[in-house]
Amino acid sequence: TKSRSNSGNWWVQHIGTSTASKMLNLQATSAETDKSGNGTLSRPTATVFGTNHTDGLGTNGETHIAYCWHSVEGYSKFGFFEGNNDDDGAFIYTGFRPRLVFIKNIDATNRWIVHDSARRTFNPMNLPLDWDESYGEYTSASRQIDFLSNGFKCRTSDASINGSNTYVYGAWGDVPFKYNNTF
């Protein structure tokens, strides 16, 4: 969510943050940030999400924009996982082969890592993009994941995607099992 009336940041609410008052800055590498001092926040429901007054959000007379996503069986999945700090990393079940995955460490300062199968069609996925940076893709042996038929697996102990921390993720399906004509 972002105020279009000022130059504030993009703020992210995610089901995987530790409390409803914690938000993530899409333009920064910072860990989750407590925004309870800026007004009340609550977890989004199926029909409602709320904002507080962080960076002008919720201010009367301002124009806002928000992108709202939720898990849809066989199409998209959003959640969190605990990294295992091992090169044989965490496996995250999505129910489909991913087309695009984002991962963000919420316990420590790290980038928003994004992998997709449009630019890299085979494993390991090692051409990430960073949502919080303006540069393009780069080759990275330290931020590799594998796209599997039913989810994705981290193939590194790098703290940005699989250290001993909590991570939020979002994934969209390539050829979802339930809706095989999605993409």
Residue ranges and their predicted role:
Residues 1-183:
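Surface-exposed molecular-recognition determinants
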